[in-house]
Swiss-Prot record:
The protein's assembly and partners: Monomer. Binds 30S ribosomal subunits, but not 50S ribosomal subunits or 70S ribosomes.
GO biological process: one example: maturation of SSU-rRNA
Family, similarity comment: Belongs to the RbfA family.
Cell location: Cytoplasm
Gene expressing this chain: rbfA
Role description: One of several proteins that assist in the late maturation steps of the functional core of the 30S ribosomal subunit. Associates with free 30S ribosomal subunits (but not with 30S subunits that are part of 70S ribosomes or polysomes). Required for efficient processing of 16S rRNA. May interact with the 5'-terminal helix region of 16S rRNA.
Organism expressing this protein natively: Bradyrhizobium sp. (strain ORS 278)
Protein name, UniProt field: Ribosome-binding factor A
First-listed, main subcellular location of the protein, grouped into a coarse class: cytoplasm
Top-rank taxon, per record: Bacteria
InterPro entries, alphabetized: KH_dom-like_a/b, RbfA, RbfA_dom_sf, Ribosome-bd_factorA_CS
């Protein structure tokens, strides 16, 4: 492998180290939120899933994708996480062995909404008709 070959790419989601650290951070944040360690009333009433974390190449920024169960109150949950960002960053630093504690940025994971939209499209009469005609032809 040539020395100038870059490891990882945007298509693969980053280097192996980025992926490994992102998964470790994801587990840490999911544990913190499930244990209710933040002690915020806006967070305590919600079950929050953390489906993905993306790390910057220098591992100094973690973009954490979240989704409250049922997809409700995303704005309230996002605001509560922003208020507790300093605490969460400290907890992540304590649980994940890195040279620097990554800065944390929260985003709502919209893949669930997109999957639901596609599922609804697949159930429309026009698509069902096309699918059935394809089955009859084969």
């Amino acid at each position: 492998m040539p020395r100038h070959h870059q490891r990882g790419s945007a298509a693969s989601g980053g280097s192996q180290r980025q992926l490994r650290v992102a998964e470790t951070v994801r587990h840490a944040v999911a544990d913190i939120l499930s244990q209710g360690s933040a002690h915020d009333p806006d967070l305590e009433g919600h079950i929050i899933t953390v489906p993905e974390v993306r790390m910057s190449p220098d591992l100094k920024l973690a973009t954490i994708y979240i989704m409250p169960l049922g997809g409700r109150d995303t704005d309230v949950v996002l605001a509560a996480l922003e208020r507790n960002k300093k605490f969460l960053r400290g907890e992540v630093a304590r649980r994940v062995n890195l040279k620097f504690a990554p800065d944390i940025r929260f985003r709502v994971d919209e893949r669930f909404d997109e999957a639901e939209r596609i599922e609804k499209l697949l159930r429309t009469p026009a698509v069902q008709r096309d699918l059935n005609s394809d089955l009859e032809e084969s």
